[in-house]
Amino acid sequence: MVPGLQVLLFLTLHLLQNTESSMVHLNSNGYEGVVIAINPSVPEDERLIPSIKEMVTQASTYLFEASQGRVYFRNISILVPMTWKSKPEYLMPKRESYDKADVIVADPHLQHGDDPYTLQYGQCGDRGQYIHFTPNFLLTDNLRIYGPRGRVFVHEWAHLRWGVFDEYNVDQPFYMSRKNTIEATRCSTRITGTNVVHNCERGNCVTRACRRDSKTRLYEPKCTFIPDKIQTAGASIMFMQNLNSVVEFCTEKNHNAEAPNLQNKMCNRRSTWDVIKTSADFQNAPPMRGTEAPPPPTFSLLKSRRRVVCLVLDKSGSMDKEDRLIRMNQAAELYLTQIVEKESMVGLVTFDSAAHIQNYLIKITSSSDYQKITANLPQQASGGTSICHGLQAGFQAITSSDQSTSGSEIVLLTDGEDNGIRSCFEAVSRSGAIIHTIALGPSAARELETLSDMTGGLRFYANKDLNSLIDAFSRISSTSGSVSQQALQLESKAFDVRAGAWINGTVPLDSTVGNDTFFVITWMVKKPEIILQDPKGKKYTTSDFQDDKLNIRSARLQIPGTAETGTWTYSITGTKSQLITMTVTTRARSPTMEPLLATAHMSQSTAQYPSRMIVYARVSQGFLPVLGANVTALIEAEHGHQVTLELWDNGAGADTVKNDGIYTRYFTDYHGNGRYSLKVRVQAQRNKTRLSLRQKNKSLYIPGYVENGKIVLNPPRPDVQEEAIEATVEDFNRVTSGGSFTVSGAPPDGDHARVFPPSKVTDLEAEFIGDYIHLTWTAPGKVLDNGRAHRYIIRMSQHPLDLQEDFNNATLVNASSLIPKEAGSKETFKFKPETFKIANGIQLYIAIQADNEASLTSEVSNIAQAVKLTSLEDSISALGDDISAISMTIWGLTVIFNSILN
């Protein structure tokens, strides 16, 4: 086999098993390439690295047991920030970085935020983004609250690597079982415990049995399940890994399919082990034989270094078409002047059929350093295209400046085909460099993205959209984890301005940003007139905008100092009809203030039609989600067709969890094969956008244990005050590129309703009101979550398994009067279940499907439960004596408040 092809095949197979950025791979049952990165804001602490090592070593043994001898941790890289002191044992990172780490160690955004969690917003079985541990969690022994740190790591690893979900539910800790008993939301039901309310007022604490809530007929809101310290149940790690007996995941044999938890909702009531054992990891990892325990993991200590970037830009003859050379230079100049961080090392290479080093690495400390590089941007296009020559010159520019290519970044832009690109794949792999690729126009080499994929770089596509090149370059910012260094796009717009007409607009500049603020305009024919006014009324005019020195039709204004907070207004006109663009970039106002951020990506970088693609956008400040924003995705196909999608954070359709700051939507509007680009715009909605001060889906805070007949309570979780659960957010704008993705097998256009059904309803709720059952849910669409479904099919049963396993034979509800609304709307429907004898205590289960005009039917929804209870006294009788007995067992117990953590 050709060596380069062998490398390509290995890397391609490796990429199929990984998320967009993770370097983790499984080799002979051992996980390799795991990266744990420490945030630059974390002060150096000699105890931190030993604690991480101890946690992972402990986790490896526990993981081996939990996976039934299939997997363990073989090697781990710990990446410390550049701000820490150098040590002989610290090695230089290769492609490891904070932004690509599997585990990050960072301070919480708020006080009392030490709960571990995994950022996970994909579908069942999809891998998560990262695990977040705080330094305080790693340095404080909270064994009673979370259990040993190694066990917590395995719980979070199952989220991250295998895409399973929690089996508890802090918002719905109890539910009514089909046996007419109240159960704690858990898996398995073999885990025993006691239900109590613990109240403290003015230093006086009272613990009592839980009372029934007259409205829900479940326990009152403050009721808590206290597990027995000594258990016989072995499952489950996704419920309470802190219990000594728990060493396995719930299986088909002991899975609690009734529990209203995220695992059942997202995975169609499949057990966690069922999801895990069908993962890609387990397809190639049979149980190890002849060993009692795996070898302990090995650790590499790495220290981040100064950023090294080399631009490798195409100046071949085809770059003369459609102003490509000018557009490239506009974007490259903006990148060098506004995006690259100070103290970075930057070089420049241009190539056609040969390559030319224009600048060896220059340390950027002032504007004069930028100008040394921008002065050498290419002015003429000619010759053929040799990408490999360009890359080799880029490597030479780096090594000749006494820097290693390993961990350095190459920004490669080309518009041409190159049949020889595969010849340097092996050299690229050996270099250790990270290659970001920008494909300009539909003829760019098809193998280009392989360079990004095999090196962990970003990939972009730019064509008709005038701002697309600037957007791509603006996205290639620091990966150190120091957000205050990153340049942020506030605006990126193109205007078709008629001669003599005025274009007016506004740019809100919020209080989290304002340093290093630039307003940039580009034009096609003649420089326009512009008037810019800050929130205090100060005006800037055309003469304040500095023209470029390269005749590339751009001008920029840098706001001195820190830009004013508030709404900036602009007006643009000209004597010529032409296309004009406006771009605004800035940086954080202060190193100690987290700026509002937006990031975006697709669920896959490569899709085979008709696979379902999902657009994801995350809006946050630090680790806290921003809710209620107006988030819009612009997707452009290879030949210019554009699709605009409003993204939703409503917990329906493609969205996993409501109000978590992750905005999503299915993308199905394919227009042919090839490359597609993604751009996302985020805007605050006045009086609607807010910052959530609570992190969702975090590790379970264990309230206490029943030990030797006594309830021993842990200190209560420090609560965020009700009035501080959310904070208002001022007006803001963010624009970000989500990179590119490629599609194959898609029709040029057409009716996708004949390919994609309506999306599954995931938020169906049911409630008895009088003799009627009232249903609510979010409407799916004609094509997944787009458009309007044709009709709903509602069925019910007294047994949830009837709906889960044999939906079509369950009792049909007459819903002929129900006309589906537009996707994303709130649906309501009520009906009288006349086919059943309605008696006090009866439980009915309801599920729903939607279909479209092509008779394609959605998956069966989540199963909702409605319980008929006439009065509290009657309901206690109807539910039997078990609950009263369980509730009252507390009165035979002694309650101890454990104020000192072990």
From Swiss-Prot:
The record, for Pfam families, names:
CLCA (PF08434), VWA (PF00092)
The disulfides recorded in the entry are none
Tissue/organ expression? Highly expressed in skin and spleen, and at lower levels in kidney and liver. Also detected in lung and brain. Not detected in lung or brain. In lung, localizes to respiratory epithelia of the bronchi and trachea and the submucosal glands.
- Keywords annotated in UniProt: Autocatalytic cleavage, Calcium, Cell membrane, Chloride, Glycoprotein, Hydrolase, Ion transport, Membrane, Metal-binding, Metalloprotease, Protease, Signal, Transport, Zinc
Q: Does the keyword Calcium apply?
A: yes
Which Gene3D superfamilies does its entry note? von Willebrand factor, type A domain
Q: What is its EC number?
A: 3.4.-.-
According to the record, which residues are glycosylated? 75, 504, 515, 630, 687, 697, 809, 814
State any GO CC term.
plasma membrane
* Alphabetical list of PROSITE patterns matching this protein: VWFA
What top-level class of enzyme does the UniProt entry assign?
hydrolase
Membrane-protein topology: Peripheral membrane protein
Q: What is its main location?
A: membrane
Q: Name one GO biological process term.
A: proteolysis
Please indicate if the UniProt record lists Lipid metabolism as a keyword.
no
Catalytic residues (UniProt): 156
Region (Metalloprotease domain) residue ranges read 45-199
> What family does the database annotate?
Belongs to the CLCR family.
Q: What's this protein's name? A: Calcium-activated chloride channel regulator 3A-1
What species is this protein from? Mus musculus
